[in-house]
Amino acid sequence: IAGEIAGEYIEPRAEDVDRAGSELVAGEVCYARGIAEGLERLRQADLMGMTLPRRYGGLNLPVSVSVMVIEMVSRADPALMNIFGLQDISETINKFADEEMKAAYLPRFAAGEVTGSMALTEPEAGSDLQNVQLKATEQPDGTWRLNGVKRFITNGCGQISLVLARSEEGTTDARGLSMFLYERDEHMRIRRLEDKLGIHGSPTCELQFDDAPALLVGER
């Protein structure tokens, strides 16, 4: 079914998707029509969160099957693959998060209710990720607040993001970093979309976090 969707629905719309691109309107990203409709077709086919355990609504399929589906979508439209493929952040949540976080977020990925992003790169930290400076500050109630900028974030408009941030004061290397789950709210602003040479249907965002609430994934 993945091959049928990719070949009969996604691929014929790929050129129009690339011409239309993504737009930033009043602070919100608007996907090209073919992207939104393609994601809905994949959701209806139960291809979202396919590697997740059944207790969270997934299909409990091996990663190799997921990779094959992603390759099919990529061949049809790499822009849609970028967004669909970011369902993979649910695997990170499943591996490292506590049971409460898994129960709260994984069923939403499996149902195709949310899209994701992996917010790593910053203006001064690209391939050298140990230089990440976005700051995470722990609150008295055990939650965290994020402050700083992320750049070149694929699908940074996604509802759920995994954000790499500096959680330990006085550190300058990777040992001071932790991963956080952030659910989109008014404390994160999309400052702009990158003007790319291609794959225009996949939005690449610059993000400004201003005291954004987040949850620690795993341990510090």
Question: Which residues does each predicted region cover?
Answer:
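Short beta-alpha junctions and helix-cap segments that line functional grooves
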Residues: 105, 131-132, 149-150, 191-195
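Amphipathic, small/basic residue-rich leader segments at the start of a protein or domain
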Residues: 1-84, 100, 104
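Short Gly/Pro-enriched turn/cap motifs at secondary-structure boundaries
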Residues: 124-127, 152-155, 171, 196-204
